[in-house]
Amino acid sequence: MAIEIGAVLALAAARHSDRVGALLFSDRVEHVIRPAKGRGHALRVIRDLLAFAPRGRGTNLAEALRYATKLLRQRAVVVVISDFRAEGWDEPLARLANKHDVVAITIDDPRETILPDAGWVELEDAETGRRVLVDTGHEDTRGRVRQAAERALQERQKKLIRAGVDRVSLHTHIPYALPLRRAFAERARRLKR
């Protein structure tokens, strides 16, 4: 979903004659496409998004944000697409927002917060590879997971607000086109005032 959103935003930037670039990362910055104008450049961004195969394991959003802050010399609109589940990203995001106009697009998957009643299930952390056996047959287990997820989402929201960035919340089970269009239209109206 993040790749699709990146592609949509790249084409929108090209259509408005805005520069577009990308910074792709895992546990380290792996690929940088410097901002430039034009449909051809936007298509290159999309091609690189589609072809990106991270070499690293895990996510270091904080390092990517620090890199972006150093990379961008002129004030720019920076869109950060992430689930923001990594640690330590809030200060680097606030620093980036001090120099640039930042939009944080959060992507959440309800399957990560609502466990089905499926008995014993082995869960694997996609970033660390750590596995754990969980008995999802108990309501209290499912409730604890749900409550922990809700607390994490609330904490993420507080950090994004403190960083002073615009926020767009998307969900994997809901088509993103309309919420994304509405969010950017509202943002444009607000910035015109």
Which residues does each PLM region occupy?
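Exposed, interaction-prone extracellular/peripheral surfaces
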Residues: 1-193
